[in-house]
């Protein structure tokens, strides 16, 4: 695993600051991402004043938009606020994003994306990366991706996260776009080998440790999203198998550490829903899973003190770890 990196994928409605602090308890090695945020939202909301916390080290902000000047305007504030990297979303296939003329549809406009990269590079000293797809529609050629890389790498982007599927616009939901277009790891590898001086990270469908181990040696690293969200303890498998960290961390410990972060916010008026909603899958694949979800739901629904999560009593169980093998 020397020189290999694992990234937590940006997930809208999920990778907020509370979730990132939760994830950092589970792993010191994973690189963190914000949710996707449009340049307009960054400029006109309190996101522009968010200061990166010390425990969020190696935090990348993912921006979306199509106006180079707005990217440049955001970039300086982002650098001043302590982020480590700026990532451009050139891969989201949702109808809303397409109507806003950003995301995956910008694969058709490589020169415009290159202008966005150039404007960021002129405005700050942070590295710039791009998250994108192999292509658009049902054609499996790589011409669109090659054109995007050729233009943007000259502009200053030397790092790409490749979701190894095409994006199907105007017809498939984001969820179906993660399932119906077939995974093409070999095509992603062809792209990696074509550009020897550029970093490439594999994304898409990486949901067991053997699959990650089989693929990571060919790339500079991997990006994992929903598997970690649905099964956060999978990060402990990653820590053990990829980083050699054999420390045992219990769920009780995770809860107690998270409360050190969450309790002061709760006392200042933060909702227990916003603070606890990312913890529902903590007991994934155990006999305590349903009991835990019901317990957590009761605390949130009745607006109870979040300290009550310390009172949860696990069922006697043996974890089913077949999904990790």
Segments (PLM) and residue ranges:
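Flavin-dependent oxidoreductase catalytic cores
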Residues: 1-325
